[in-house]
Amino acid sequence: MKLLLTFLLIIPISIFAQPAQPVEEWTGKTILLIGGHPDDDHQSHATLAMLKDHGNEVYILTMTTGNVGTKDPKISRFQLAQIRRQEEVDALKEIGIPEENYINLGYDDGRLEFADREEAIGKLVYYIRKIHPDVLFSFDPGYNYVVWQKSDHRAASYLAADAVRAAEWRLLYEGHIIQDGLTAHAIPEFMFYGGNISDKNTSVNTTDYVERRVAAGLKYVSQWSSGWSDYKGPDLAAYPSSDRKAMESRIRNRIIVENGNSYERFRYHKGPPDTMGHGPRD
């Protein structure tokens, strides 16, 4: 008995935080994913496709235009922003999310941590209050420590966390309420992606949605093909025949497979935003 109690004390509290209703059974919820770039949602694509098919409303919000991510000297920032927006719209179509459910805040790629923080949080608060999500998907800011993410991912995770907290207090960014007719909103559930494997407590069976995740990933031609350094347009037929195979291998190699089933893993949290990043405290 003493050994059992000792074991229970050293297990991170987060492993017991799995959703009472399996994600595979969710229906009628509104989902908002906040990411840094126009492909950050890809690691959740199979889960998002499943949720959409199960009668949930799914929105994707991207903080930056992705207008820096290329090694092709022929492409300008403006051109790349347009290319990456269309890639994201096309990818979302593959998983059933319409263009009108895609929001891009227009910040420069690689510079999000230097953006006006109050303004950025205010924009996120606006969309949280407008959409009223039941569940937020975002990069994991960390559990009891800061998770290392590259700059835009790190900034997006903390901006999202702070915006969630601000959105529920009506006297913060009250112009949304007084002028825009929105209402304060508290998000009750969170699905964090991109964190450390040891912190993840929820595996979603996405076996039936693997091919849609692959099809969506193949739309990111400027990022995951030789278009990264020599962009020839969105059609993979314009690239070496090996590109499609390499892209597909990249996508499939990142899919978790156990006992013949495919999964996407998350750190699930239910509760106030103040406790999303730590266990019980005195």
Language-model regions, residue ranges each:
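Metal-dependent de-N-acetylase/amidase catalytic core
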Residues: 18-31, 118-282
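Bacterial N-terminal signal peptides
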Residues: 4-14
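Active-site rim/loop-helix segments in enzyme catalytic domains that contact anionic ligands
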Residues: 18-131
